[in-house]
């Protein structure tokens, strides 16, 4: 992982473009914020379930990774919900869905794929709309989440590639 001299933004980085074959359903910034909260809520619940499965399967370090990313998704939810509440007072966050973990290697791949989607498709699409609408707060929280999701994907792939290393 490389450190940078400046915080990446859509203005100074080249990996904020929206993919040509985007599968993200894009709405207004408010709709996108709500979609992000809903998606992150599901991801957080899924990662908590994956942590429990990893622990049960004897992968304690990977369980901690899933616990940490579940907690990180809660930070994204809080930031996004905070911007929603400024636009729509009284907004209530969605309830976390039921989630279940499966084999740890498959959970890592599914997690990485979800994070790659968010960092390469969903958040760039949402950032573009926030910029068009002039919503700097939404642009900031979407950008922060986008950058974090890239790190999560990298961590999941590293764990997947090293799942049978003797340290876990």
Language-model regions: role of each:
Residues 2-168:
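Non-heme di-metal
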């Amino acid at each position: 992982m490389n450190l940078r001299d400046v915080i990446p933004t859509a203005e100074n980085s080249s990996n904020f473009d929206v993919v040509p074959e985007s599968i993200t359903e894009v709405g207004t910034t408010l709709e996108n914020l709500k979609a992000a909260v809903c998606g992150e809520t599901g991801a957080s619940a899924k990662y908590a379930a994956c942590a429990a499965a990893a622990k049960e399967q004897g992968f304690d370090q990977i369980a901690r990774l899933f616990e940490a990313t579940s907690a990180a998704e809660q930070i994204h939810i809080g930031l996004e919900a905070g911007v929603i509440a400024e636009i729509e007072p009284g907004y209530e966050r969605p309830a976390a869905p039921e989630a279940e973990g499966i084999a740890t290697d498959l959970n890592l791949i599914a997690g990485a794929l979800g994070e790659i989607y968010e960092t390469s498709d969903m958040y760039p699409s949402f950032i573009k709309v926030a910029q068009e609408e002039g919503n700097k707060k939404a642009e900031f929280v979407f950008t922060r989440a986008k950058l974090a999701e890239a790190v999560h994907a990298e961590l999941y792939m590293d764990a997947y590639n090293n799942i049978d290393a003797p340290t876990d």
